[in-house]
Amino acid sequence: AKIKEIRPNLILIAGGVDYGERDTAIANAEMIRSMNLKIPVVYAGNVENQEEMRLIFPEEEGEQLYIVENVYPKIDALNVEPCRKVIQDAFEQNITHAPGMEHVREMVTGPIIPTPGAVMECTKLLYEYLGDLIVLDVGGATTDLHSVTVESDQVARLMISPEPKAKRTVEGDLGVYVNRWKVVESIGEEKLREQCREQGFSMEHALETYRAIPKTEEEVKLVELLTREAVVKAAERHAGRLRYIYGPSGRSTVAEGKDLTQVKYIVGTGGALTRLPHREEIMREITRCNESGMLLLPGEHAQILVDHDYIMASLGVLSKR
């Protein structure tokens, strides 16, 4: 019932290392098939289940099944890139079902890629030239953080589960226009009011006149405060962390999540981080917010770069031609 409420555009079924546990993925697939959703299904689990999946989602009955290599083929090994590519292919083939998109397909001869996916493609290309990096895209509705980096040897010894080399997180509550009230709530209304007062303007007045593209000095200052919160929160959520665990032999340290300590470059793209006056200082906050020392965030050595021409998403699409 919950799946029908969500009305997903695509379902990914995974689970079970190759030649390991089979039953859970099969049971989930049968339940999904019984819902008669008529949407693409991607299977990226135990290789032994592939034939079973073809029987559950028969092509001759109009089912759209994509079978891809296991995302978790063996313990402590991730293999996400083949699955990522197939999801992109499924998106392209089915995007024309969205209102108005059939006309876009008629005009476009190349690939159609959602903006976060396009920015990730560009980020992976930049990695080949620059090395370890993260890219931040603060928009009106979301804040996306893309990282392509390998964990340090020190952190690798502490990791309790693997992380992909290329990772993207999309924070749906950290947009600086559509979701501005959620960012205000994240900062704290009283704290934000005081920050605005220190900069010589009224928070209430700035929010009353607030628009998608700031025009006045007050609006620009307010957007910068919201953007700083979005950037820091997105980085904290994306980054892994160290954690203490206690056992018979005493306390030990483990690492969970994505290690960003090797990142050499922090890149800003999107409307806010390509246009705001203090965009570089805002991004620099990522390297200063790790007060506990337990977050695996970039250090002060990281350099700040800005996509001044706002072309990373376009370059990501062009790279797929």
Predicted features by range, described:
Residues 1-133, 219-232, 237-238, 242, ...:
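Nucleotide/phosphate-binding catalytic cleft detector across ATP-hydrolyzing
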Residues 38, 112-114, 158-233, 299-320:
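Glycine-rich phosphate-binding loop plus the immediately following alpha-helix
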Residues 124, 128-198, 277-301:
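Glycine-rich phosphate-binding loop of actin/hexokinase-like ATP-binding domains
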